[in-house]
A protein has these predicted regions:
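Active-site core of glycosidic bond-cleaving carbohydrate-active enzymes
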Residues: 1-155
Length: 155
């Protein structure tokens, strides 16, 4: 999903350049954004919004970063993300790339109930699992403490 982040950052660079008066650079980044987005859609997205990487992360990034072109693709991607969330019992199934955006992807696409359901999940891996285990800070791992109260030694 590095491509998704590249496209997102290129769009941000375009806006930043325009904001500071670098119109020529802004136009260049805007053109690069268009080319990269078109490539992304042709390579990774089907007509009905399915992505070649069928994961929570892929759909969350595509929705959050506005990488889908048609309402049909957006609706299809959202439905697939909802299905993947249900399949995973609303536990977080993203890595570092998708975790910061998955709740926004739901909320910004009128699926706020899914965002709240994922946020309220207490089974590992979830945002509330560490809280249910007494955490007062962010853990390095979802399961730093095991259900029996022992520290996870890792592997």
């Amino acid at each position: 999903m590095a491509d998704a982040y590249l496209i997102h950052i290129t769009r941000i660079a375009s806006k930043l350049a325009e904001t500071i008066g670098k119109v020529k650079e802004g136009d260049r980044y805007k053109q690069q954004y268009r080319v990269l987005k078109e490539f992304f859609v042709k390579r990774y997205v089907t007509y009905d919004g399915r992505l070649s990487s069928d994961s929570q992360t892929a759909y969350a990034l595509a929705l959050k970063f506005g990488l889908l072109e048609t309402p049909r693709q957006i609706e299809g991607a959202l439905k697939r993300l909802e299905w993947l969330a249900r399949l995973n019992k609303f536990k977080v199934g993203t890595g570092f790339a998708g975790t910061p955006v998955i709740l926004d992807a739901f909320a910004e696409n009128n699926a706020i109930a899914y965002a709240y359901r994922m946020l309220e999940e207490k089974a590992n891996p979830s945002w509330l699992y560490p809280v249910s285990m007494g955490a007062t800070t962010i853990w390095e791992r979802w399961d730093s403490m095991l259900p029996d109260g022992s520290i996870n030694p890792g592997t």
